[in-house]
């Protein structure tokens, strides 16, 4: 497929770099070229990963509530972002929640990430899921300083079954966006 979608002439987000999820279909233009048609599109909450100086002390202030990372559609690392599909228990869908990705850089583990979640007391009830994306510019800086183009990210989080972790292969983004 080449070029912009057939039903969109400019980004609905302006020049802002965002992660989005879309429902699309393929169609042919008048010359027989395959194009896409966007049925719907929604932006994904996007944040910078946070680099902390004193991670042991500071992690608690970012939250230690439990959530699940969905191992499937939506959980991916690409283009300088870690996008996560998550699920957690809640009673009030409109209650404030904070999710942050902490870069816990050390000599031993230069690419360790900790997902910190603060449910602000609303951590029981029905499960609901969502998406969040984190820009990995701190990881990019560390990897480039170490002369790496590809690294293995080590993500840790608190799950309902206890502490969990997983690994992601990541191709370092080589710009400073």
Question: Regions from the language model: what does each represent?
Answer:
Residues 1-39:
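Start-of-domain marker
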Residues 8-16, 107-112, 174-177:
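Short, surface-exposed linear segments at secondary-structure transitions and domain or protein termini
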Residues 13-18, 25, 119-160:
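Short, solvent-exposed, Trp/other aromatic-anchored flexible loops in extracytoplasmic proteins
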Residues 17-23, 35, 81-87, 112-114, ...:
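Ordered hydrophobic segments in well-structured contexts
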Residues 30-87:
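Surface-exposed beta-loop interaction hotspot
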Residues 70, 102-104, 116-118, 137, ...:
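A structural detector for beta-sheet-dominated domains
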Residues 70-125:
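Short helix-loop boundary/capping segments
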Residues 161-177:
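Short beta-strand elements
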């Amino acid at each position: 497929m080449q070029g912009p979608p057939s039903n969109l002439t400019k980004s609905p987000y302006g020049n802002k770099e965002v992660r989005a999820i879309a429902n699309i279909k393929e169609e042919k233009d008048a010359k027989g070229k395959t194009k896409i048609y966007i049925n719907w599109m929604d932006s994904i909450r996007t944040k910078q990963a946070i680099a902390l100086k004193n991670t042991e002390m500071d992690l608690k202030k970012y939250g230690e509530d439990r959530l699940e990372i969905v191992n499937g559609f939506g959980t991916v690392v690409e283009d300088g972002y870690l996008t996560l599909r998550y699920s957690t228990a809640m009673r009030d869908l409109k209650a404030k929640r904070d999710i942050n990705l902490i870069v816990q850089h050390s000599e031993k583990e230069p690419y360790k990430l900790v997902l910190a979640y603060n449910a602000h007391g609303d951590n029981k009830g029905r499960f609901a899921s969502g998406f969040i994306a984190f820009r990995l510019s701190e990881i990019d800086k560390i990897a480039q300083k170490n002369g790496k183009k590809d690294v293995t990210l080590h993500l840790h989080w608190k799950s309902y079954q206890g502490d969990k972790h997983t690994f992601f292969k990541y191709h370092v983004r080589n710009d400073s966006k």
